[in-house]
Amino acid sequence: MQNNNFNNGAANNNSNNNGGMMIMMNGTIRTMEVFAGTVKSAMEAVYGSECKVDVHKVVKNNGLHLTGITIRNRESNMAPTIYLDGYFADYKDGRTMENICKEIVEVYEKNKVQKDFSLEKVTDFDNVKDRICFKLVNREKNAELLEDAPYVEYQDLAVIFYILVSKDNTGTASITVRTTLKEMWGVDTDTLYDLAKKNTQRLFRGRVLSMMEVMAEIIGDSADALDEEMVEAFFDMDVYEDSAFPMYVATNVFKMNGACILLYDGVLEKFAEKIGGDFYILPSSVHEVLFVPANGDMDARYLIEMVREVNATQVAPDEVLSDNVYMYHADKDFVEMM
């Protein structure tokens, strides 16, 4: 499952028409506009005249602009947005248009909204209050989004809210809570925060793992693909609890939008008790943060430089959380931006 946004609308879906797709594009497509139009035509061929297919621009996390396509059916006036930018990159790398469109059909069929989830249910607060969750985003980079969405400030970040439509081990489908929806519900931001905190902790259980434990999971997930020498090399790496630079990964069991574990009840306090003092918080991405015990040899400036270098070279633009580093002061139960 991709990380899908949902939109309103109405259309019909003839889900058993996949065999009717005919992709017929000679030559090379050079622009996203032409590519998106070709995909749109293919989806209309698959789902028939009663289907409504739309292509639109979407502003994602950190102000990233993407091109999305929605396929709407009459059974639900909502539809997932499937982003085309990655597919266009694949096309330019040689992937065929037919192969791409077949995958888009598969993605839609897996993620389409079921009959029991509709816009009417979203606007009824009682129907969605147990699905309201939160996540952390960069406040400055999401200024445009925050103009039209309730949020709570946290350091240089913002806590925003969403309705969880579905989730599995490959992703989530969600609806961002906008100001108009909040006003329709007749609730305040504090109420949203309290509900979201309870729901997020319940639906996305948090965990803090040492690097040794993370490496063990990686080995376990890919053991068949690694030979004995590679496995030994992993465990010879000097990055664990007994190293001079121990690091711990804090996220949730789904490893999705896990940076908000910082807001979970007791997480920071319990970790401080475990290590016996203060620790740095490194915003690895929107999906996880790193905890690094503070000691006299630790240089905050080095950590900040490291975070900024990793963000610039290793983290996807829409997954960057912050270029800053924070410290948790155990004696004051207080987080400070360095």
How should these model regions be labeled?
Residues 2-9, 17-60:
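N-terminal alpha-helical "arm" segments
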Residues 31-32, 44, 99, 103, ...:
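Basic, alpha-helical nucleic-acid-binding regions used in initiation and control of genome expression
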Residues 27, 31-39, 92, 96, ...:
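Short amphipathic alpha-helical segments
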Residues 57-248:
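Charged, alpha-helical interface segments at or near domain boundaries
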Residues 245-257:
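Short glycine-/aliphatic-rich beta-strand segments at the starts of folded cytosolic domains
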Residues 253, 261-338:
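C-terminal structured domains
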